[in-house]
Amino acid sequence: AGNAKMSALMALTIRGCCSHPVCSAMSPICG
């Protein structure tokens, strides 16, 4: 359940994450 919740959260906030230098650097999907 924890993993599913985290995956959903990342999917919903990936664009927001990629707009932040630190989060983007920690997320390979941001390129």
UniProtKB/Swiss-Prot annotation:
GO CC, any one term: host cell postsynaptic membrane
Q: Which UniProt keywords apply?
A: Acetylcholine receptor inhibiting toxin, Amidation, Disulfide bond, Neurotoxin, Postsynaptic neurotoxin, Secreted, Toxin
Pfam families membership = Toxin_8 (PF07365)
Q: List the disulfide bonds.
A: C17-C23, C18-C30
Which GO terms of the molecular function aspect are on file?
acetylcholine receptor inhibitor activity; toxin activity
Taxonomic superkingdom: Eukaryota
- State whether keyword Mitochondrion applies: no
Q: Which InterPro entries match?
A: Conotoxin_a-typ
Q: Does the keyword Thylakoid apply?
A: no
Q: Which residues carry this modification: Cysteine amide?
A: C30
Organ and tissue specificity: Expressed by the venom duct.
Q: Where in the cell is it found?
A: Secreted
Please list the residues that make up the propeptide.
Answer: 1-15
Report the domain remarks: The cysteine framework is I (CC-C-C). Alpha4/6 pattern.
Which family is this sequence assigned to? Answer: Belongs to the conotoxin A superfamily.
Q: What does this protein do?
A: Alpha-conotoxins act on postsynaptic membranes, they bind to the nicotinic acetylcholine receptors (nAChR) and thus inhibit them. This toxin inhibits alpha-3-beta-4, alpha-6/alpha-3-beta-4, and alpha-2-beta-4 nAChRs.
User: Beyond the main fields, what else does the record say?
Assistant: Negative results: does not show inhibition at neuronal alpha-4-beta-4, alpha-4-beta-2, alpha-6/alpha-3-beta-2-beta-3, alpha-3-beta-2, alpha-2-beta-2, alpha-9-alpha-10, alpha-7 nAChRs and muscle alpha-1-beta-1-delta-epsilon nAChR.
Name by which UniProt lists this protein: Alpha-conotoxin Li1.12
> Which organism is the protein's source?
Conus lividus
